Amino acid sequence: DREGAGKHIQAGAKKVLITAPGKGDIPTYVVGVNAELYSHEDTIISNASCTTNCLAPFVKVLDQKFGIIKGTMTTTHSYTGDQRLLDASHRDLRRARAAALNIVPTSTGAAKAVALVLPNLKGKLNGIALRVPTPNVSVVDLVVQVSKKTFAEEVNAAFRDAAEKELKGILDVCDEPLVSVDFRCSDVSSTIDSSLTMVMGDDMVKVIAWYDNEWGYSQRVVDLADIVANNWK
């Protein structure tokens, strides 16, 4: 929160970049989505979560091209340090279970946090996380209802266009039948698995996107820090 991060300012830091979702009124920026709105007046900012960094870029494309009415997201996420290696105590009883032995359903604020960088989507997205026994790389499964009728090839074409233009280096599209380990050390925020894109009844769209929740996210932290440095006054 602002009080906790503010201790760094009190100790002499000029800026604080939180590498996690911020609380309260802390401004949130996602590179490729709204980072161009960064103001030098912001002393404490958040780079959101790795999952929001994966989700927001391709959600932005979907909303701009087809208009998102509502949707849900599931991230199948490698287990993290906030879980227990052995069954033990935790405020979340599911995270209390042995992380390397279980699929652990738990909460995530990633979908709702998209509204912090794309305000027009406030109240339209929600989701959960499934923590799984893999060391790295995660995958988002998004299902949305859209206002414009479409089909899978058109959806993938929109992603390809964005990946080659305004979201180059942020979004990628993969046509190969790959698995999670193939996306280790991927520099982009999200990679669309084109063969898994589905459209039901011409207005319900399902998109699968891979992301390296460690390395890929770290790249965006560096990018945002660079934006802060380049706007120094």
From Swiss-Prot:
Its EC number is 1.2.1.13. NADP(+) binds at residue 213. Its main location: plastid. One of its GO terms (biological process) is reductive pentose-phosphate cycle. SMART domains: Gp_dh_N (SM00846). One of its GO terms (cellular component) is chloroplast. Keywords: Calvin cycle, Chloroplast, NADP, Oxidoreductase, Plastid. This is Glyceraldehyde-3-phosphate dehydrogenase A, chloroplastic. Transmembrane segments: none annotated. Plants contain two types of GAPDH: cytosolic forms which participate in glycolysis and chloroplast forms which participate in photosynthesis. All the forms are encoded by distinct genes. One of its GO terms (molecular function) is NAD binding. The keyword Membrane does not apply. The lineage of its organism: Eukaryota, Viridiplantae, Streptophyta, Embryophyta, Tracheophyta. Pathway: Carbohydrate biosynthesis; Calvin cycle. The keyword Membrane does not apply. It is found in: Plastid, Chloroplast. PROSITE patterns: GAPDH. Tetramer of either four A chains (GAPDH 2) or two A and two B chains (GAPDH 1). The active site is at residue 50. Belongs to the glyceraldehyde-3-phosphate dehydrogenase family. D-glyceraldehyde 3-phosphate binds at residues 49-51, 80, 95, 108-109, 131. The record marks 77 as: Activates thiol group during catalysis.
